[in-house]
A protein has these predicted regions:
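Extracellular ligand-binding/catalytic regions of CAZymes and related secreted enzymes
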Residues: 1-110
């Protein structure tokens, strides 16, 4: 919430259990020290986040840079492609999307 995420945002999936091959991005590091790798630092993860907005809008965000590269795996017959197909199908329908209700006071996110 401290960086502008609306209060009704839902984390619908999160990665975890990363090895020490995964490290924080350089933007998150002020000073490098031991323990900033996947088995030690809880910040090393990718979250999928969903929230609704005004006028029946919504936002889906994948926290992984590899999300797009996973789509063509196995000829697009995989769980990431199915997830995206379900999202596009839901977002293309008329009417409200499922999820937490957006209220006008939340436009003051900061």
């Amino acid at each position: 919430l401290e960086r502008g995420t609306p209060p009704h945002a839902k984390i619908i999936a999160s990665s975890g259990g990363h090895t020490d091959n995964y490290v924080l991005v350089c933007e998150e590091v002020l000073y490098a020290f031991p323990g900033m790798t996947g088995t030690y630092d809880h910040r090393i993860r990718a979250d999928m986040v969903y929230f609704t907005s005004s006028n029946n809008g919504a936002v889906f965000s994948s926290g992984s840079i590899a999300f797009g590269q996973a789509l063509p795996s196995h000829g697009f017959n995989n769980n990431v492609s199915k997830l995206l197909a379900n999202l596009v199908d839901a977002f293309s329908k008329d009417g409200p999307l499922p999820g937490g209700k957006w209220v006008s006071e939340e436009k003051q996110w900061r």
